[in-house]
Amino acid sequence: MQKLNELQLAKELIRFPSITPVDAGVMRFLEKKLKRLGFKTKILEFKEKGYQPVKNLYAKLGSKSPNFMFAGHVDIVPPGNIKDWTVSPFKPSIKKGYLIGRGANDMKSSIAAFVSAVSAFLSRNKKFIGSVSLLITGDEEGDAVNGTKKVVDYLKKRKEKINFCLVGEPTNPNKLGEMI
């Protein structure tokens, strides 16, 4: 199994205009990538009364403890006035060594890093103890009603245990780990 390139994957993710709550196909794209790595996947769509439905993705490889989960989101805020951008927000580019595009910082690059790290791990560890999972929501930038909390509740009902979780959210300026 060959390691996925995190920069290439981040660019592919940025091309999806996944403005909350519309996923624009990004969940199916990630699902296909993860299935190729051997993950069992489930797209979970939740709709709370009075809110737009949101797609989330749960992917897991392995069935034993401990379960190490990566958690994050692929939804983005609207790009605003396109004329204010120096590049097209959904056509990723590299400028002065930085990846530019809507969602590059928050948080499609983190999702790409998660998936490429898992692919690198799997390329060196054919058999490992435990499980690796990803919880990817499409409801962090908006009301955050039909996302992470609902997926965690779903997992609890199925007796899925999360032993460790790495959240790649880069944007809380005040306190590390305070937000997702």
Short names for language-model regions:
Residues 2-100, 124-128:
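Acidic/His- and Gly-rich active-site-bordering loop/insert found
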Residues 19, 74, 103-105, 140, ...:
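Gly/Ser/Thr-rich beta-alpha loop segments that engage phosphate groups in nucleotides
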Residues 92, 100-102, 133-137:
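Short glycine/serine-rich loop segments
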Residues 109-116, 123-180:
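Fold-level recognition of mixed alpha/beta catalytic cores in primary-metabolism enzymes, strongest
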Residues 97-113:
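Glycine/serine-rich anion-binding loops at beta->alpha junctions
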Residues 1, 36, 171, 175:
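Metal-dependent amide/peptide-bond hydrolase catalytic core
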